[in-house]
């Protein structure tokens, strides 16, 4: 029996998205979005100067290299990372999306804006993956993936799905902690 790997890859992510993530994000409030569970969290915050990352009225905290240990992050930061570093950059590099980067992205200032962007980027990613046939999944990722340029696209797709599952789980845990705080 032949296996349609593109369908398997998208079905796995769609199941996770539709049954474990998307509906659990419904009703996310701005208070939850910006909640800092500990002092010193990385987050998305109102811009104070033009030299901060991003464009528009909000910026995101980040540093290269990342500090050790990395700071605890807010839901706003996690969603910003998913939008730019996980989905947006790969949509731009591999599926014809608009260029995107931490320094140039207009970070969402509300939970509703972030979830709208997440829905849009998720749909673009899945649509892009659905264009990959067996040969497309086997071809090298190319220079956009730096030292992983020679890895097959299937490896990148699996990595992005793992990242999306991982970071969305963190977002949902933060939401649970917010709801259960004393």
Identify the residue ranges that each predicted region occupies.
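Short, contiguous alpha-helical
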Residues: 1-104, 142-182
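Acidic/histidine-rich alpha-helical segments that form the ligand environment
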Residues: 105-138, 155-165
């Amino acid at each position: 029996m032949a296996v349609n790997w593109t369908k398997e890859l998208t079905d796995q992510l769609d199941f996770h998205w539709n049954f474990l993530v998307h509906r659990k994000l419904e009703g996310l409030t701005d208070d939850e979005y910006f909640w800092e569970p500990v002092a010193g969290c990385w987050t998305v915050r109102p811009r104070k100067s033009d030299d901060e990352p991003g464009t528009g009225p909000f910026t995101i905290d980040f540093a290269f290299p990342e500090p050790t240990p990395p700071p605890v992050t807010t839901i706003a930061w996690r969603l910003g990372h998913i939008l730019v570093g996980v989905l947006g950059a790969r949509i731009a590099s591999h599926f014809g999306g608009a260029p995107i980067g931490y320094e140039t992205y207009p970070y969402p200032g509300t939970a509703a804006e972030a979830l709208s962007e997440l829905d849009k980027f998720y749909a673009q990613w899945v649509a892009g993956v659905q264009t990959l046939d067996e040969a497309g999944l086997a071809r090298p990722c190319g220079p956009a993936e730096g030292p992983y340029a020679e890895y097959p696209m299937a490896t990148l797709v699996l990595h992005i799905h793992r990242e999306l599952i991982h970071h969305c789980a963190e977002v949902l845990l933060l939401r649970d902690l917010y709801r259960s705080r004393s």
